Amino acid sequence: VRDYIRKYSPSEKLMYVQREGKDFKPLTLEQSYGLLFPEQKKESDETKHRLAVLTNLLSCIDIRLFGATFAIKGANTSIHGPVQVNHGINRFPANEIYSEQIKAPFASEAGADMTTIGSQTNLREGHYVFHITVNPKNIEEIAKAATHDGISTDDITKLKEALTRGVTALDSSRKIGSENEALLWVTLKADSTKHLPNFTELISVKIDTEKSEKRVIHCERIAEVLARVSAEIDSIELHYNPTTTSVVGLTGLTVKAFDIVSGQAM
């Protein structure tokens, strides 16, 4: 998400990305902060200084989204981010793992064979599901202290864009074949006090071997949960690639569907 925002929203400030100095060594946290906010001066009053630092930190979109533990002298701050992401779990039944050697283009010494520098292990096919929650209330109190609005609608829009495009857009040989497959986004009403369970274990992914060879994402158990709290739901969005994927089981719910490739409504 950070990498996508850094590349495609260059006007946004990001605190927790690697930066290098003139010697090509990574900057420290304090050096990175100083680079982002060169106008920041040490306030004589410790409380005022901490609030000034907090205001600066909240101008960074990654901190508004994910929070931070910021530890520099005189301004230790912990911000509980509105966005929480769990570890991905593979919900595809077949787990075919294979390994391959990585060879260097050079010999270790004159006359020797090409050097093997290691091996990499890959999964033939997997469909990793991540449960993501967004609770703006996590940051309300600390944003109020810093006279900041906290997480904005524009922040959420950029988050969703990154969640539907970030993996596909990432340039890396290790992720070849990895793409954003689907995003199910459920928004509760502003006054709702309900908390939805983790959807990860409620999803399964199979292959439609009889017809199209598409990957079929089954959401029947999620639909059962959402049907019980339908009065609390403001909207449901589903982003997926209809060329390669089918999503089933959300019948009975009002769902706005979008093509994850084009971004257009379907």
In which residue ranges do the predicted regions lie?
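RNA-binding basic/glycine-rich loop and surface signature characteristic of RAMP-family CRISPR effectors
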Residues: 2-266
